[in-house]
């Protein structure tokens, strides 16, 4: 089998295609959650906390005063952007929770596999486990029905 045939077989396998679709949908879902956090969750939270815009929260490490995170970054000042980190953390928590709920629902619909039929039975004389088709116990040599 040539390299092209091997690649074609690999590329069209169900798992590869499923993975590609999952990555694309996951990327789009991440953008939706980021927008949800930035545009819907954080503004009311910032208002409750005294009109704080979390994306502008930072610690200035340069010692020079800056009015905003953008001004500090434009000046090349070293900063710790903990407000952006808070937004990212909330994004992660929401995504993790949604994925947990989706997987929980998917697992609810999965059918449990039927239990395997027993392949041994108990000898009524010595109580040892013997193969289901056995007519004589290998341990005590008693006849088994």
From Swiss-Prot:
TM ranges: 16-36, 83-103
Membrane topology: Multi-pass membrane protein
Cellular compartment(s): Cell inner membrane
Major subcellular location class: membrane
UniProt entry tagged with the keyword Transport: yes
GO MF term (any one): mechanosensitive monoatomic ion channel activity
Entry keywords, A to Z: Cell inner membrane, Cell membrane, Ion channel, Ion transport, Membrane, Transmembrane, Transmembrane helix, Transport
Pfam families from the UniProt entry: MscL
GO CC annotation terms, alphabetical: plasma membrane
Subunit structure: Homopentamer.
Function: Channel that opens in response to stretch forces in the membrane lipid bilayer. May participate in the regulation of osmotic pressure changes within the cell.
Family named by the database record: Belongs to the MscL family.
Descriptive protein name: Large-conductance mechanosensitive channel
UniProt organism field: Geobacter metallireducens (strain ATCC 53774 / DSM 7210 / GS-15)
Gene, per the UniProt record: mscL
């Amino acid at each position: 089998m040539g390299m092209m045939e091997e690649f074609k077989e690999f590329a069209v396998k169900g798992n590869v295609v499923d993975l590609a679709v999952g990555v694309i949908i996951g990327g789009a879902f991440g953008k939706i959650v980021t927008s949800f956090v930035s545009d819907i969750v954080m503004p009311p939270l910032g208002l409750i906390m005294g009109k704080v815009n979390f994306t502008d929260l930072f610690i200035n490490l340069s010692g020079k005063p800056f009015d905003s995170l953008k001004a500090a970054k434009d000046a090349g000042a070293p900063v710790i952007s903990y407000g952006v980190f808070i937004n990212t953390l909330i994004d992660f928590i929401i995504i993790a929770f949604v994925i947990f709920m989706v997987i929980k629902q998917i697992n609810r619909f999965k059918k449990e596999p039927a239990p395997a039929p027993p392949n041994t039975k108990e000898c009524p004389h010595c109580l040892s486990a013997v193969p289901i088709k056995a007519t004589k116990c290998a341990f005590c040599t008693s006849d088994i029905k």
